[in-house]
């Protein structure tokens, strides 16, 4: 593949309001995972992954526990997934994943950032085919052959293993996430995953260098992040200041 996985940490966690947004996002995802499966992370792998991810992002334990208890009690909202695709500032490709209890409200909220930044929301599938749905695991290391051997011994369907600047990035189909992570944990005792994601990785990137377009892009992403129903935003833009 010839490309290292870049972890883009959002600046949204820098304010109290943004932290509340992060907590709300995880609370909703954990609630849905627990409600759609077993409310026990030892049985429900999706729930376990979300809990581990939430803890890494410093989501308070009471937020996690409340979401699971709410799902176990059978009460609460009925959420459905919604995905919107299109072209953002600089003609970058964008995927917006949502959880919603009101699809009409959600499409209205998501469409607004596109409209306000002269971007274009498209039809389902218009850009998703230009992204790979990957499990991505990143950790310190410099020997890709040893990592690849450990994964192949566990019969993991590996797409790629990259090494760059003392960091190993493992790419596998998203369906291989738990298998790949378990294989690495068993092969390398005490492994610490700096990247632990199921995500959409763009097949090609687009560089944005114009200051006005960069400002418009920042506005676009901020407006999407402010939408209550938006859970994840994926794009292929690389900002060059």
Curated annotation (Swiss-Prot):
GO cellular component, one term: cytosol
GO MF annotations, alphabetized: DNA binding
Subcellular location: Cytoplasm
Gene3D superfamilies the record matches: 1.10.10.200, 3.30.70.980
GO biological process: regulation of DNA-templated transcription
Sorted UniProt keywords: Cytoplasm, DNA-binding, Transcription, Transcription regulation
Keyword DNA-binding: yes
Family in the record: Belongs to the TACO1 family.
Protein name: Probable transcriptional regulatory protein PSHAb0060
């Amino acid at each position: 593949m010839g490309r290292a996985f870049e972890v883009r940490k959002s600046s949204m966690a820098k304010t109290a309001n943004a932290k509340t947004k992060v907590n709300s996002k995880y609370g909703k995802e954990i609630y849905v995972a627990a409600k759609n499966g077993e409310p026990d992370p030892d049985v429900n792998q999706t729930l376990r992954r979300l809990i581990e991810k939430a803890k890494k992002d410093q989501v308070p334990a009471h937020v996690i526990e409340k979401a699971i208890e709410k799902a176990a009690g059978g009460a609460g909202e009925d959420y459905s997934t919604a995905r919107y695709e299109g072209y953002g500032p600089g003609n970058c490709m964008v995927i917006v994943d949502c959880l919603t209890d009101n699809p009409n409200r959600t499409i209205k909220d998501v469409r607004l950032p596109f409209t306000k930044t002269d971007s274009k929301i498209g039809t389902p599938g218009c850009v998703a085919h230009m992204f790979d749905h990957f499990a991505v695991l990143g950790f310190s290391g410099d020997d890709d052959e040893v990592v690849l051997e450990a994964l192949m011994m566990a019969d993991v369907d590996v797409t790629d293993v990259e090494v760059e600047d003392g960091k190993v990035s493992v790419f596998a189909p998203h369906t291989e996430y738990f298998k790949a992570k378990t294989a690495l944990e068993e092969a390398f005792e005490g492994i610490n995953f700096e990247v632990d994601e199921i995500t959409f990785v763009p097949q090609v990137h687009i560089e944005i260098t114009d200051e006005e377009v960069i400002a418009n892009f920042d506005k676009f992403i901020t407006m999407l992040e402010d939408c209550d129903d938006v859970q994840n935003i994926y794009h292929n833009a690389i900002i060059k200041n």
